[in-house]
């Protein structure tokens, strides 16, 4: 099965055919660095990191560009409020973004350009647009004329006349049409500026991505990505100005990830349901957040809630427990030539093919992880039955590891991950870990003395506080429910 991707431009899944055989050029809109990143940013960046990883796994040489928007109204407003230069704000939050992305296990893109380092390229594109009649200067500003580009709104499928008639749209004094957008903004007091043919000023948001993508990927490239919220106006305007300037198609495949909802409501600062990545990682392991974000298809909306994060943590823990069980069984004394379980052998051997088929169907990570859980269930059954051929278990481990390497998951040492998760859960309990261990010792003594009533009381007391005791021949361990 060849890779098929959903193209927002056509509204259908299409066979993925690159401009150059074996090479992919991909541009993804980065963040505006004026504040801490929220979980919507986490989703977009994890999704395109997954796509980046899978394309390389599939044998492509990938040039991946993700920018920083480091000059913008929001950055300037924050800088003025704090009384510092705008670049102090942008550099601070670039560093915060980089820390967040490293925690989430993202591979570095090929290039991470900053808008402020590409002003000359932006001015060159604007000059071409003015010369071709697609843009006009107006008292220090430069605007793109949407009526001059007859394919405007082809990405979002909106209607220009209906939008013009909308009550919320007002014609500015300088604009010829209410939907015309700024390519260059004349300087204002208290704002950074650069020299240009139209006077001192700074670029508009949309021209930044066009100029940077053209510099690193050329006038036409394979994939342009971002969140669904960028389809209009940002990506629509990028297409208009880029294709008007170059007379060529801009990007062939437009890929957009779905929204993040908070407890079934749209994430919004005004609703008070706005969570930064930093806040989430104080309560949850970074790999749990990444696993949660990849557990749904990238185009589907995803509901962020404590319950869903806890379920993701439990699912990831099941996988790590299976890996730990495999490692223990493979390392155990013996010949390793036990019974060969046909179901386990088939699922282990078949996982790479099933994984590829799922991912080739528009990067369906939800289906891919479903196949991993199928294998994990077979592993757990076989481990419980005992007397299994270690080579088959090792092949199951290798198959899961290969999937994890592509998705950026299952990279921790299993025992260490389980302990890390246990420690996080224990930190939220109303009882200290040392007290749990003391009660387990008391329970062991009670059982040895055949005081089963006291042993049961201790078990029930711990259960009421969310602690589950696990008795085995090796002793008693505990976990958080």
UniProtKB/Swiss-Prot annotation:
Domain of life: Bacteria
Catalytic activity: tRNA(Cys) + L-cysteine + ATP = L-cysteinyl-tRNA(Cys) + AMP + diphosphate
Xref: Pfam families: CysS_C, DALR_2, tRNA-synt_1e
Example of a GO biological process term: cysteinyl-tRNA aminoacylation
Subcellular localization, as worded in the UniProt entry: Cytoplasm
Binding site for Zn(2+): 29, 209, 234, 238
Broad class of the protein's primary localization: cytoplasm
Signal peptide: none
Motif 'KMSKS' region, residue range(s) on this chain: 266-270
Any GO CC annotation of this UniProt entry: cytoplasm
Entries under CDD domains matching the protein: Anticodon_Ia_Cys, CysRS_core
Protein residues bound to ATP: 269
Keyword vocabulary terms for this entry: Aminoacyl-tRNA synthetase, ATP-binding, Cytoplasm, Ligase, Metal-binding, Nucleotide-binding, Protein biosynthesis, Zinc
UniProt family annotation: Belongs to the class-I aminoacyl-tRNA synthetase family.
Subunit: Monomer.
PANTHER family: CYSTEINE--TRNA LIGASE, CYTOPLASMIC, CYSTEINYL-TRNA SYNTHETASE
Name this polypeptide is given: Cysteine--tRNA ligase
Organism, as annotated: Geobacter sulfurreducens (strain ATCC 51573 / DSM 12127 / PCA)
